[in-house]
């Protein structure tokens, strides 16, 4: 049976809402298929329908957060990675933080007059639906420029702990005769970035989160879906190849932005996108391919587009995409070094095409 893509999820949600009074989507960040298999005897999963689905590429939160609120696949919305090129600024930005890439703080784009709607000019699903909708986010970004746009026309709920957020959402749905709600749970993702996906505490977080989902006071008959945006691959700072260290002349072959710096790094350490000068693309692809032969695959982005890896590519994605991507092998990472701004310190990362990063579950559970 063909594996379904996360891009199909918005249509499934709408179909479920037309057949049920209440639907809840638990967006369990980094809850990979392998974790669903490992915890298959948990009461929530044991009593549910569980299917294997696939992330969109790149397998990142920016892609899937935008899809789940806008209803658009990455090929249409164009927010394809944590760091992406923004044409109107001729700079790399971090859309979900509403900042310039590497700033390390949220909201710096507000200082240059860029609003959330400039980056997320889409009508959210909730504006098109005729039933009440709720979106729950951790307090740190519940009312950020990005979430205020993506969640427009929904009631935004801000929470502290996972259990508190689930209870808030469940009670909000209980206050409506008919309604939809979604919640973003980032704890597992955050932990694995810092400690790695194989660290013992990972299983404890998964169990505690599944327990909290099952224990939340969902109204009887609520269809509760649990899915994720991506999985997680093990990496390390010691096994990170910095492309501008491996090849010191590389910056001379890249396009430069409005700040005079190379347009790097777009993407992440598992899918490093480079904006190469068009007339240098063949040379850079060949040379980086040689230098990283034992560490990564170096691919022309146009080849991936032709293979359908991004799905249908529209104007918003096309004008933001780089033209070369480095896809590290298992246990490897590739990034750009600018001390104090761009360094690879994580033990877990995602964005690539490996099964550990791409395979995700879709859990469908009916509350009693």
Residue ranges of each PLM-predicted region?
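Feature captures the catalytic ectodomains and active-site-proximal regions of enzymes
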Residues: 1-368
């Amino acid at each position: 049976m063909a594996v379904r893509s996360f891009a199909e999820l918005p249509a499934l949600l709408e179909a479920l809402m037309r057949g049920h009074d209440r639907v809840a989507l638990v967006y369990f960040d980094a809850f990979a298929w392998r974790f669903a298999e490992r915890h298959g005897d948990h009461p929530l999963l044991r009593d549910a329908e569980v299917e294997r689905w696939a992330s969109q590429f790149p397998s990142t939160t920016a892609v899937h957060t935008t899809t789940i609120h806008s209803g658009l696949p990455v090929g249409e919305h164009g927010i394809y990675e944590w760091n992406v090129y923004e044409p109107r600024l001729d700079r790399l930005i971090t859309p979900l933080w509403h900042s310039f890439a590497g700033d390390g703080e949220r909201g710096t784009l507000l200082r240059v007059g860029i609003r959330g709607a400039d980056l997320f000019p889409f009508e959210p699903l909730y504006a098109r639906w005729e039933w009440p909708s709720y979106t729950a986010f951790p307090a740190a970004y519940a009312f950020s420029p990005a979430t205020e746009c993506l969640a427009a026309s929904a009631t935004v709920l801000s929470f502290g702990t996972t259990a508190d957020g689930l209870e808030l959402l469940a009670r909000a749905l209980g206050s409506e005769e008919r309604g939809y709600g979604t919640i973003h749970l980032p704890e597992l993702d955050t932990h694995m970035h810092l400690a790695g996906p194989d660290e013992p505490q990972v299983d404890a977080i998964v169990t505690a989160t599944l327990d909290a989902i099952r224990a939340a006071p969902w109204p009887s008959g609520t269809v509760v879906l649990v899915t994720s945006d991506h999985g997680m691959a093990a990496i390390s700072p010691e096994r990170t190849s910095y492309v501008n260290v491996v090849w010191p002349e590389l910056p001379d072959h890249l396009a430069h932005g409005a700040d005079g710096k190379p347009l790097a790094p777009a993407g992440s350490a598992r899918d490093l996108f480079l904006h190469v000068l068009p007339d240098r693309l063949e040379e850079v692809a060949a040379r980086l391919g040689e230098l990283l032969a034992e560490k990564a695959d170096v691919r022309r982005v146009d080849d991936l587009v032709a293979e359908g890896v991004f799905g249908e590519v529209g104007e918003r994605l096309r004008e933001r995409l780089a033209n070369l991507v480095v896809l590290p092998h298992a246990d490897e990472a590739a990034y750009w070094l600018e001390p104090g701004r761009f360094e690879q310190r994580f033990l877990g990362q995602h964005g690539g095409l490996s099964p550990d990063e791409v395979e995700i579950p879709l859990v469908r559970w009916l509350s009693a």
